[in-house]
């Protein structure tokens, strides 16, 4: 099962860190752009080649120390068909090095549309899992659930997201006296029972932001079967202490995504005097190692078992 493979990858790499590949052309090292523009031209094709080359460098630097990468489709979709080519090439390269690939697509629509989105991603061998938006109702995510089970894939449903505005809808009290995100959590946890693996977790997981630690603590209890994909660590403000309650006492239950803080580590105050732009990939590796160590130390302090 997807979830069993994910947990085994976490154990093998001794890390719950997922690297988010969200490249921005304006932040891409100039030497990479020079190579790409010389090869493809200073145009959309060249831009997308630069994004791919940047990603390739990051993947080469971290594939042996992380279980998975998460690729946010918007950073590629913005460039049309060439962007999608870079998106798929990135996934293909990551898979070739043994990484699990999460397509961060956050799809959510009526059933017939959802079936097509699911066909595009969950029926594609390049992707191990996708993110989905369940806020249109249970019927809109069932095509993903059915395909996840059929094709041995995973989904992570948005429950409590890391953005500040999540409270505008997710924190509204329902007529039952609970928050909307709690109602969604209960729905996802119930659905997750259909795909439980040998470690007690389901291939149907949840997105729970690092920026809401108190809510995460509640959700860990309300969603005992669900593995959490945790965004918001690092650049968005989430800390090691904030994410501890996403884990169980065995050190599992969550994968922690970091995008900007890793892939642009060479530009951060901590690393900018150590690594140049030519060493952006080495800086990313150093940041992952640092992040993994901090998380595992946090788990040990909680008397949990580190990865």
Curated annotation (Swiss-Prot):
Is Hydrolase given among the entry's keywords?
no
**Database matches in SUPFAM superfamilies:** Ribulose-phoshate binding barrel
Catalyzes what?
Answer: orotidine 5'-phosphate + H(+) = UMP + CO2
Q: Which GO terms describe its molecular function?
A: orotidine-5'-phosphate decarboxylase activity
Give the enzyme class: lyase
Q: Which family does it belong to?
A: Belongs to the OMP decarboxylase family. Type 2 subfamily.
The UniProt keywords, alphabetically, are: Decarboxylase, Lyase, Pyrimidine biosynthesis
Which biological processes are named by the entry's GO terms? 'de novo' pyrimidine nucleobase biosynthetic process; 'de novo' UMP biosynthetic process
Membrane-crossing segments per the record: none
- EC numbers, comma separated: 4.1.1.23
- The record places the active site at 106 (proton donor)
What protein name does the entry list?
Answer: Orotidine 5'-phosphate decarboxylase
Q: Which organism is it from?
A: Thermoanaerobacter pseudethanolicus (strain ATCC 33223 / 39E)
């Amino acid at each position: 099962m997807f979830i069993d493979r994910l947990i085994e990858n976490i154990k093998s790499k001794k890390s719950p860190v997922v690297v988010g590949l969200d490249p921005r052309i304006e932040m891409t090292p100039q030497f990479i752009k020079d190579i790409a523009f010389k090869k493809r031209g200073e145009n959309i094709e060249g831009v997308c080649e630069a994004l791919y080359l940047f990603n390739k460098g990051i993947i080469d630097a971290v594939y042996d120390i992380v279980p998975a990468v998460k690729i946010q489709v918007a950073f590629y979709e913005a460039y049309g068909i060439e962007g999608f080519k870079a998106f798929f090439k990135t996934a293909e390269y990551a898979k070739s090095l043994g990484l699990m690939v999460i397509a961060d697509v956050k799809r959510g629509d009526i059933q017939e549309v959802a079936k097509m989105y699911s066909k595009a991603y969950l029926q594609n061998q390049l992707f191990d899992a996708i993110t989905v938006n369940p806020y249109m109702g249970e019927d809109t995510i069932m095509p993903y659930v059915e395909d996840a089970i059929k094709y041995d894939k995973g989904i992570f449903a948005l429950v409590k997201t890391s953005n500040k505005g999540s409270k505008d809808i997710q924190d509204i009290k329902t007529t039952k006296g609970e928050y909307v995100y709690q109602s969604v959590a209960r729905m996802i946890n119930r659905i997750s029972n259909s795909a439980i693996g040998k470690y007690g977790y389901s291939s149907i997981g949840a997105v729970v932001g690092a920026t809401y630690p108190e809510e995460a603590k509640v959700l860990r209890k309300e969603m005992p079967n669900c593995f959490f994909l945790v965004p918001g660590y690092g650049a968005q403000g989430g800390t090691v202490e904030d994410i501890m309650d996403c884990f169980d006492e065995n050190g599992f239950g969550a994968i922690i995504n970091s995008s900007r803080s890793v892939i642009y580590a060479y530009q951060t105050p901590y690393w900018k005097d150590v690594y140049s732009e030519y060493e952006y990939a080495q800086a990313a590796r150093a940041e992952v190692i640092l992040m993994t160590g901090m998380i595992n130390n946090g788990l040990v302090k909680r008397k949990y078992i580190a990865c």
